[in-house]
């Protein structure tokens, strides 16, 4: 348990997933990946990816609540999990025949889930490895997290023919290139 100080005074941060479901998301994801490799065109992999979606969203339902959920690094981790759930849902629906772009699910998983999770880890590790507290988060980190989240949202929109030129701009702004 970590205790928050400063402008965000609240109860100790506690995240306790239900013991029986602690590894369900990872297990269902591994089962889906194995079935997608062995029987890629089978309906089994479609149903397993939907089971992985349910497990990821179940884990997200037990996320931090209250004021700690509004901290940038916690919100980015939650958004990454939300993108993972949405990506698995779209991937499963596409495999079951729903008329969705086939790249929308993988883009939600890669750009959304992975991008937001990596940004959160960079924020946390960057502060911890330089000996600073998480309350010492500068405006640049908040801005980079916001741009990463916006880029993840905008990356999926071109699949539905909207805002196709905005994604590269938002992806380049956090790095300054």
Residue ranges and their predicted role:
Residues 1-177:
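Hydrophobic alpha-helical transmembrane segments of multi-pass integral membrane proteins
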